[in-house]
């Protein structure tokens, strides 16, 4: 029995050692990842390794796993505008490493390449672009500013083998004094527009009254001319007046109209 145990122990140690070596000689690269191989003798290998299970030489080689999917990051910078206003701007970037240059990225920057590059790079670009615009231009030309920041950041990041899939301004604010000044200016503009509207309205009403008065005066003038120049019109007005008098007399109970040649009116109810 003791002899059997003495033989079993070395065998178990051999098998265990073999399994350990086999396990340490294998590694897996998941989806959305790449591996860079570091060799203790030759250094970082020039080619990155794709997805799947791969073999390495235990102890001599070590896989460094990179996530190559796009990752978000916010970059904030407090800077100054062209007219010396304090500006706080934050941009959101979606970044990923250039797969073709992973060995170089690891050799020069390491796994935390984004932490080493993006904050300083973003701060540099934001200060440079914002300084070209006045505070009001940063508001009114936000799309232009955002485009310039995006193009500049992408260009600079590419120098470090970083790819930016998207860059957008998420926050843009100014000092409290400038904000208050903008609000006061907007209120003043609204009041000016309101006053302008009231003046225009009064002017229109004044013009309308003048036109109406001129029209009425012209109409009265034309009527006067017609009355003075038209005998038929005068005769018509005389007949209408005579008709009104006749109708008024016919309704009176104390007056009788006698159609004689003298057109006499006689009071029949003399007291």
From Swiss-Prot:
Presequence boundaries: 1-24
Coiled-coil stretches noted in the UniProt entry, renumbered to this chain: 201-221
Keywords: Coiled coil, Membrane, Mitochondrion, Mitochondrion inner membrane, Transit peptide
Subcellular location(s) of the protein: Mitochondrion inner membrane
Chief site of localization: mitochondrion
UniProt keyword annotation of Coiled coil present: yes
Keyword set includes Mitochondrion: yes
Biological process, per Gene Ontology: mitochondrion organization
Record CDD domains: SPFH_prohibitin
InterPro entries: Band_7, Band_7/SPFH_dom_sf, Prohibitin
GO (cellular component) term, any one: mitochondrial inner membrane
Paired cysteines (S-S): none
Bilayer disposition of the protein: Peripheral membrane protein
Matches recorded under PANTHER family: PROHIBITIN (PTHR23222), PROHIBITIN 1 (PTHR23222:SF0)
Protein's job: Prohibitin probably acts as a holdase/unfoldase for the stabilization of newly synthesized mitochondrial proteins.
Family according to the record: Belongs to the prohibitin family.
Name the record gives this protein: Prohibitin-1, mitochondrial
Gene source species: Dictyostelium discoideum
Upper classification of the organism: Eukaryota, Amoebozoa, Evosea, Eumycetozoa, Dictyostelia
Protein encoded by which gene: phbA
